[in-house]
Amino acid sequence: MNLTKDNIPFLVRKLAIPASVGTLFQTFYNIVDTFFAGKISPEALSALSKSFPIYFIIIATSIGVSVAGTSLIGNSIGENNKKNILYYFSHIIIYGLIISVVITFLGLNYSEKVFFLMGSNTEVTTLGTAYTDIIFYGSILFILVVSLNSLLHAEGDTKTYRNVLIISFFLNIILNPIFIFGFLFIPALGVKGIAIATIIAQLVAFIIVLIKVIQNERIKEISKEYFFIKYYYIKNIFFQSMPITIAISGYSIAATIVFTYIGLSSEYAVAGYGAATRIEQVVLLPILGINTAIISIIAQNYGANLFERVKETYFVSIRYGLFIMIISGILVYVTAEIVPTFFSSNPEVLDFSTRYLKISAFILPAYPIFFLSNGFFMALKKSENAMLNNILRNVLVPITVFYLAKYLSADFNSFFWLWAAFQWTLSLFLLLFVIYFIKYRLNKSSRVI
């Protein structure tokens, strides 16, 4: 498989399908956690739902590190610059270690405040912090896995990480009930057990990816000299990674705003919305897979100055994404009253889940435009563009919707219809901007890094 020569639609499918399957199992992983949290209590389900914006800081950091490594190493592969491949690989690991320490410190010291900010009662806050504290102690594993895997993604290998996520999923199914409810000498740990199962699965993932990377031919000439910190490479990684991390972390702000507003209804509304978003995540998996594919494809072709292939990759991915999400939206709407019963039997929780999913069905086709446009800019090393897009979507739009909803005294449904209108407006604006960028600025864009 050659990312700079093979047929573009073939490459998108070839890379996106394994990535989508891997992400499917990652989402199933989260669904299993949600399922078992619901078995503990509605309060535990609410705590896990509210912990996601906090936990998402680790996810955002991991995405930033992964995209930086994939795009910078991918560009170096396209340029056939072996020295840069080795330096970027070694420095993405160093950067990952440094940033994981910072993330752990922030998470352990500020999680409780965020739970209270979302209007959580004492029980939900206690359950939530019991979960997030353990997750933050293990954050180094999350970030090291994606740091190492960025080399594989840059080459177009999405199968290894897919296999890792599948293994992690089955481990999680086995470990969750053991640590939650207790087994033999292991005591019942409740929500703490969910977190411990996650950390063990991440440790296994780290070992698998490390073995695969050690066997990679591209780093056979690496030596300890490449791990002496060089400002040039750390700087490039920082300015490629941090805008993405900051921008995607904005999702935590968005989720906090949403949870704060719907929490005015009840904790059941929070639990119902939290369960519904797990379903939404499953539906979005093909888009995330396509996004992973185009970052690898565009990064190498951009590095090789093959601008027509860059353009074709973007538009092929948009067509695929829109088709998939239109079909998915129809399915979500039709099954909105059935699927949430997997997570809860509480009538109020189910009612809120169904109401959100029937609105989400109309938002789904807007998502491929947003995610794939961001992937386009990330692959071009234009992280500042992706950062601005995410700030608009995850900070400015939620704040606007929040205050507009308060002004209109909007109920649960009205709040999310406002949300849908703003999501579509932003996505259409972004599509027009990318078309303009491709037509007038693509082959003139900076090649400094």
Regions found by a protein language model. Give the residues of each.
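Transmembrane helical elements of multi-pass membrane transporters/channels
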Residues: K14-D33, I134, V145, S168, ...
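Interfacial/gating helices of multi-pass transporter permease domains
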Residues: A37-F56, Y88, T122-L127, V191-K192, ...
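Alpha-helical transmembrane segments and their lipid-water interface positions
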Residues: Q26, N30-D33, A37, I59-S66, ...
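Short alpha-helical transmembrane segments in multi-pass integral membrane proteins
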Residues: M1-P18, I73-I140, A188-M242, I298-I363, ...
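Small-residue-rich hydrophobic transmembrane alpha-helices
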Residues: L45-F105, F142-G156, T160-Y161, F259, ...
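Transmembrane alpha-helix boundary and packing residues in multipass membrane permease domains
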Residues: A19, T23, T34-F35, S71, ...
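Short runs within selected transmembrane alpha-helices of multi-pass transporters and secretion channels
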Residues: S66, I135-H153, Y161-N172, I194-V209, ...
